[in-house]
Each structure stands twice: as C-alpha cells, then as structure tokens.
Amino acid sequence: MRADNQNPSFTNVTLTKSTKSLGSKAVKLYASTAQDLMTWQQRQIRAIMSTNKNGEWKYSKYCIALSRRNGKGEVLAARELYALIYLNEKICHTAHRTTTSHDAFNRLYTLLKKAGYEEHSKKKKDMPEKSFYASKQYGLEHIEVTGGGVIDFRTRTNNGGLGEGFDLLVIDE
C-alpha cells in the first residue's frame, strides 16, 4: 500500500459529534474480517449509515463518484455485510457488467467466510446461526444469511428487478 495521501479530493462529508450512525459498527464488523478500510472509506460508511433523531436513514440516496479501482467497492461491501447480518435487509446490488456484479458477489462471499460464517450448499429451514446459503450461478448470484438478510447480484436490464421490493438498491459502476 502506498504511504502518501490516500484521501480522494471529493470528500466533503460533514459529520459532527452529534451525528448518529451505524457506520462505526459496520467498520468494526468489516475489521473483524482482517480487512482495513482507509480513513476516507470509514468516513463514507459513517455518512451512508447516519440516522436522524427518529432512527431513520438520514440519506435515502447516497453517491460516491470516483474513478475506477479507488476503493468504492470496499465501502459498498462494508455496508452490505452489516446490512445482511444485523439489519436483515433485502438488497439488490446491480452493475452494468456481469463481471462487476460477480466480483462484488465474490468480495461479499469472502467477507462472510472471514467473519466466521459457514456456507451451506442447500438452503434449509434449520440452518445454524452464523451460516449462509449462496447461489453462485454466474449472472444470478445470491446470498442469504441465516436469520438475516438477502442480497441479489444482477446486471441492469429493462425488466430486471421489476415488481420486487428491496430495502437497499446498490448501483455499482
């Protein structure tokens, strides 16, 4: 890793000491997988997952605009990992290219394993805690955490996801 400044020039997120956020918990969970987030990534997670005084998400839409291969995917993975395990969210992770979607699936799959979750080859009603089921079919990847959330990885099409409800829509470019 390079030792010089790793902060993107776009970072203008305002977080005060009174800002409530689940982001610190997500960063801690991510760190339990032996992965580290850079300071700017941690700041983005805290902003994305900040809540208002009623405990609702502060931002219904959030965008990180960076060029390719600058660490956006790790921010998304940290958010998705926490959502699957603790928020029981139904997530749709979309990308323009199948390879991008597949890479995101592999990243999250690996993080779950590193977090101590055991994969089961078949979805069963009585799967133990800290386990998950994953469908690895290329282009139709899917992860379901026992007692937790679900995430579908897709490419964008004219009718993909129509009629379905998701708690979180991730548009990965």
What are these regions (language model features)?
Residues 1-173:
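Phosphate/NTP-binding elements of NTP-utilizing enzymes
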